[in-house]
Structure formats: C-alpha cells, structure tokens
Amino acid sequence: MSDMKAIKNRKILKVKTDGTPAETVDDAIAVESQLSVVLNGTSYVTLLCTPEKLEDLVVGYLLSEGIIDKPGQLSRIQITRTHRCEVDVTPEPDLQKRIEAVDSRNPAVFKGNRRMLSPSAESGSDLAPLMASSDVTFPLSALQRAIDTLNRDASIYRKTGGVHATCIASKDGETVCLAEDVGRYNTVDKEIGGCARRGSSFQDKFLATTGRIT
C-alpha cells in the first residue's frame, strides 16, 4: 500500500494586494501522484491522481473502460510502495488489441489512457447517445442534499482548494460514498469502483460531481 498523503504542507510566499508586505506562510497543497497500472504483467496505463482510495480508482477505471464487467474478475489487486498497481484479471483481456486501437486513433497518446485521447474523443462527439432505460426519478431536495454533502464533506478541497469531489447518493440524497481527486475523471472512477467493490446497486442512485460533464 502506498504511504503517500493526499495533502502536503508547503511554505509559500503570500503576496497581498492591499500594499502590505508579502509574507511566508504555511499552505496546504493537494498532492498529485503517478500510479502505474499493470494488468496480468503488462504495463497498461499511468494515472495521475490523488494518492488515496487507489484500489477503488483502479477498479472503477477497469469497469469504465470495459476491461472488466465486475470486480469478481480480479483475483489480485495490490498497490506497491513504488506507485504501481498490480492486477490479475480473469479471463485475460486482449490488452494489445486495445493499445493498438488507441494508437491508431492518435499515435501521440499515452497507451491505454482515455484521459489523453484526441479532442473529438474527449468531448464524446464521436459517441452515440445513450438512452435511459430506467424510470427512476429523484426529487430536487435529494439533489440539493447531495450537493450540500459535497460542499461540507470534501475535506481535501476545503483545505487546499485544488481537487474535485464526487458522491453517489440514494433516492433521498443520502451519500453512499464520496471521493476526491485532482482529476475529475478519477473521482467518478473512485465512486464507481468503491460502490462496485461493496456490491452496491447503481439502479436507484445518482452521481453528483464538482467537475464539468463532457
């Protein structure tokens, strides 16, 4: 398990606009770390992330990418102190095919990393729209309750102002889980992975996030 912290304290020079002298003060800084994901011995992707809830992040990423359908396909997931996540997946995915598919769309991208795809792919303009298959509705009060929770409980953001936050909530707005990260995509993956690992159903839940949806 990584022993990195999500926040570091650094001395900064605080420059004021009221004409008073600048001063050196302690400030809380959000940490960004690299996490190299190795699938069945193959280096697949390096994620830039806040170093907490890393297992949830990796599981959510694999689910979002369609590499796995459920957490039960993972026979091992281990975060090392060298910022690697070693994952054993069954059945073994065709990683080379995925890497070649990404390379063919944009040779400059980092292999396997959807967060560095071309602008058209990033915006979703090349994807067919998905139609809702559920008739579940949520009252406005539930949405407001979830947003209030984000504003209140996003502790890293409140200390640093440098991260996004996402929560998954039930029909009445009660938060099931909450995640923070320097990357807005990562917060969603952490939520998906965390809920999936706990066996929570997504059928009657909604997601609230501080990041823009694109």
Question: Model-derived features: where do they sit?
Answer:
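Intrinsically disordered, low-complexity regions enriched in acidic/Ser/Thr/Pro/Gln residues
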Residues: S2-D172, V176-L178
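Acidic, divalent-metal-coordinating active-site segment for phosphoryl/phosphodiester hydrolysis
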Residues: T214
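Glycine- and Gly-Pro-enriched alpha-helical subdomains that act as flexible
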Residues: I156-G211
